[in-house]
């Protein structure tokens, strides 16, 4: 395999602020290395120590790791615990009962505060109500809800009973919801009348009804509806129930059902490259352990922090760093219903200032769109807001290009907040490669080093290690407690997708291209393996070309894909959003030429995009991820046949199609 070539030359280094390091959970690179050494010396002992110290077990485990049926690994299997008990009851016992657990801000700006005692009561009453409806340990419950306290309550109530939840993002279509209901074998669906996004009401209950009408969901005996807006909804007597009625009159306590550490806490569906979505199955013990460890290590969570992860509970980030991790850590967190651009694009900065957020965790896509908004309107520039409460920033969901990193560092963190650029996946359960804010010298665009206990490596297509400085395929060499256990109902697909025989069947395949710096050993993620371009025999990660484009002062956002080319094998096609209005005609030709030359100067002639198309924005999911598969189809001139139900802005496809 020809090495994936990294053309990013990033030499800026930012050390942890002294005051931060001295108070941090991991205060130095020496402390980081000591933990890595402990894991190398005694891998099972390392994980067992943390599991015993950090979690409450109703039955202590005696066996740490079972590898007898690899790659179907089992951790702490003979131990028993309950995730909801660890998140809620322990906080009632350790003095946090009257501490605020959730500061909920609705789309319209109204704020509700819920203490740990109140949250525990809500969860227990709802869990008792579910039990009264016949929902038991091992049942699967699908949750299709807006961002809300009630969404977290629904997840925690399922965990309390030992019912496996499967949260479906509120932006998914009826067909997508139906597929997940059928695949997971749900016995109940928890939804809402409507959800609010950017001042608009979206009809969740109507979509849920349509999903159930598509058939195959006969096992769903109960549809429980959270009354979010009071909007009118269709009603099926005997099946549909209001959430408040399910909880009404139920006791404030509900015994937490002990489950095996390997009991499925949840199944979360993620897109497959082909075929139906993959139901990623996570365990209870190993998953919860890593959620809590990464809250302590990556976010350095302290008792007086106000933590805000802007994700949706429909994605894994919202599971680990809203519904479970912060509660297990006894933290106070913001939960937000709305969008970053309503009522204007200063919403995030306004909320940080009003609530005095200290740790802020968001996606690079959101940062890039807010850069564009801030530069277009001085009134909503971050400098207009008091962001002095912040002490730590984070990014999640995709690699962050160095220019966006620097803007975030300067304008949001005021050059005093470390940035944890976290690489992880739905399948990994929690962070894998990330800076530690009190220890790691930061390099813009690099997720730096694996967390202690995570044996990440870069290999070629035969599974052999490649030297630092050469690109390759990111893998993890040893199992870890929070890893995916299987694909729900499809163990063979799990084995082929994540432990392919081509790599020897024992390496976890992350599916991303990566490179390690020759000197520091730092990892840079170069995009999905299928986002690697091969132009005239040169293999390049799309992220690097995107970073070069975005570093041009005219460019707000860029996405790069490949298309077949008779001469070069593959040609580079760039979709670009400018900081000003979209150019057309002669002006578009002129700016495209400028940008080609810019990339040639930044990277080299081989990286010049053959095609550049300008749009008002890029096709994105409602969670803000760029839908690159649609861009690939556009670049190739193909008709769009893929599912576009999660697309936030469908009209952009026609605009980009016409832009060629």
From Swiss-Prot:
Matching entries from Pfam families are given as: ACAS_N (PF16177), AMP-binding (PF00501), AMP-binding_C (PF13193)
Assigned EC number: 6.2.1.1
GO cellular component terms, A-Z: cytosol
Which GO BP annotation is one of this protein's? acetoin catabolic process
UniProtKB keywords? Acetylation, ATP-binding, Ligase, Magnesium, Metal-binding, Nucleotide-binding
N6-acetyllysine modification sites? 625
Asked whether the UniProt record includes Metal-binding among its keywords, one would answer yes
The record ties this protein, via InterPro entries, to:
Ac_CoA_lig, ACAS_N, AMP-bd_C, AMP-bd_C_sf, AMP-binding_CS, AMP-dep_synth/lig_dom, ANL_N_sf
- Annotated residues that bind ATP are located at 397-399, 421-426, 512, 528, 539
Q: Per its UniProt entry, what is the enzyme's top EC class, as one word?
A: ligase
User: Which pathway does it serve?
Assistant: Ketone degradation; acetoin degradation
Q: Which residues bind CoA?
A: 197-200, 317, 536
Q: How is it modified after translation?
A: Acetylated. Deacetylation by the SIR2-homolog deacetylase activates the enzyme.
Q: Which residues bind Mg(2+)?
A: 550, 555
- TM spans, by residue? none
Known catalytic reactions: acetate + ATP + CoA = acetyl-CoA + AMP + diphosphate
Q: What does this protein do?
A: Catalyzes the conversion of acetate into acetyl-CoA (AcCoA), an essential intermediate at the junction of anabolic and catabolic pathways. AcsA undergoes a two-step reaction. In the first half reaction, AcsA combines acetate with ATP to form acetyl-adenylate (AcAMP) intermediate. In the second half reaction, it can then transfer the acetyl group from AcAMP to the sulfhydryl group of CoA, forming the product AcCoA. Although acetate is the preferred substrate of AcsA, propionate is also used, but at a diminished rate compared with that of acetate.
UniProt protein name: Acetyl-coenzyme A synthetase
Q: Which organism is it from?
A: Cupriavidus necator (strain ATCC 17699 / DSM 428 / KCTC 22496 / NCIMB 10442 / H16 / Stanier 337) (Ralstonia eutropha)
| Gene name of the record | acsA
